[in-house]
Amino acid sequence: RYDRSGSSASFSRAFRMNPLAEAYDEEGNIRSAAWEDSSEAFSVNPLSSLNNKSNDIRSKVITNNVVEIKLPFVPGLSYKLNTGYTYQSSSWKQYQGMDTYYGARSNGILNTDDWHSQEWILENIITYTREFGKHRIFFTGLYSAQSYEKEGNGMEGKDFPNDVMYYYQISKAATMSGSSSYTKQNHIS
């Protein structure tokens, strides 16, 4: 499990920013707009994203297993089983409050994205090796199956009455939209 919460400053906006712009107001707070300009490309303060409330937690479990059996009653015959399993989950939430450039224009913007995935692989390998004088026989047989499945849900809310509850207030949004996705893949060879 690892935590990737927080937002970083925008270096691309810093390169485009007017050098005369002020990133902080008189009280030392980060301004949402560094320059009063009609062009969004030049007016967004590259530091304003530091005011975003962001929560990004991810978890991942991986297991790989191998079993090899050499059959003593048939010289040169062996069986190998390879298995693997991966589970991942992610919970991402970001609230752009009234103190951010985009949040101020929409009375707050909340985005959430939650997903989980699992995948597995199973490989059966039979190998036969035998030497007869100057001759050698080598045979490999493989049967493999694998699966991948991912499910995700996202929400966006805009126009909040206040900034008090950050990303725990989706039901308070005046405008909401949602999305969901599902993917499943199976392979046999």
Listing of model-derived features with the role each one plays in the protein:
Residues R1-I62, S78-H187:
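Surface-exposed loop/interface segments of Gram-negative outer-membrane beta-barrel transport/assembly proteins
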Residues V67-L71, Y128-R130:
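Residue-level signature of outer-membrane beta-barrel architecture
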